[in-house]
Amino acid sequence: SHADLPLKTYQIVNTFRYETKQTRSFIRVREIHFFEAHTAHVDEADATRQIEEDLEIVENLMNELKLPVLVTKRPVWDTFPGAWYTIAIDVVMPDGRTLQVASVHHYRDQWARAFDVTYEDASGNQQYVHQTTYGMSERLLGAIVASHGDDKGLVMPPPVAPIQVVVIPIISKGDSSEVISESERITSELKSAGIRVRLDSRDIRPGQKYYDWEIKGVPLRMEIGPRDLANNSVMCARRTGGKQSHSVDHLVDTVRSELGTIGEEMKKQSSDHFNSRIKMLPAFTINGTDLIFDQAIEKGTVYEMAFDGNDAEAEMIEKGTDLSFLGDSTTAYKKKVPCVITGKPTTRRIFLAKPY
């Protein structure tokens, strides 16, 4: 019945494929974990609203993960089979290649007609439903690890870090009970405030503890020694770099501020990388079916261009650049720009890249 729509379902499934290409952890695997939403709607317009909601969710999630992304409507030849259109979300990896981490598909009523999926409308007539799919995979974890990690290990965005703060007591010779007691008190205070915190009271050197937690990517390390205790303070070390002493007064607010700063530093670093990898496609001349570029096509670069040509011309550009069409950016040019092939003014903004 129309009263049952929209119908929205969510599932986590694992699928297997005989992957013939080189496998890479999180990026190209034989067992794939999909996180999928499947929806059915009364008409095309309502399904389109669902697509818009999905893209808003993606934007919010990627903002939390501090990952700038390319959002493109895939070309016809790269659209999911049976879909009216596909919109994909790609992260630009450290080597300049792109990694698709999510996609949304609008099917209109094409699958409903194939499988006779109908509903009864308000007038009692049978109508075909309009369907969408929104999904992600563990490639998202690969993007986090590769984009934010450094030579020391992981760097986890504070909103998704399993442990946001690690408290490390610095034990010196003599009575350590006060340092331990204060470390436990601070841990309890942060935990009560909803901060994901861990007290590391292992009987090993502080340097080894630092090393362990840096590898795991914990955003904030908090050190408490006899000197800090005497000064009513703690030493905070950010995983993104930098140390600063803070008073234990209003410590919850201080920690939240530090985590916010870490997130902003991660966002700036990833945004700087993202922007540095995107360039305008160099000018070229056409010699038969070959493109002769004024400048060499750089490895590890995502190119953008204004394009309003046909499929054959798109294929010629792919061949000439040895790159793939990601598709039309969802953020088109505000003013019309000449197409790189035809010269016809267009607002279509196309991205070219070497995808994983």
Give the label of every model feature segment.
Residues 1-356:
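NTP/phosphate- and nucleic-acid-binding module
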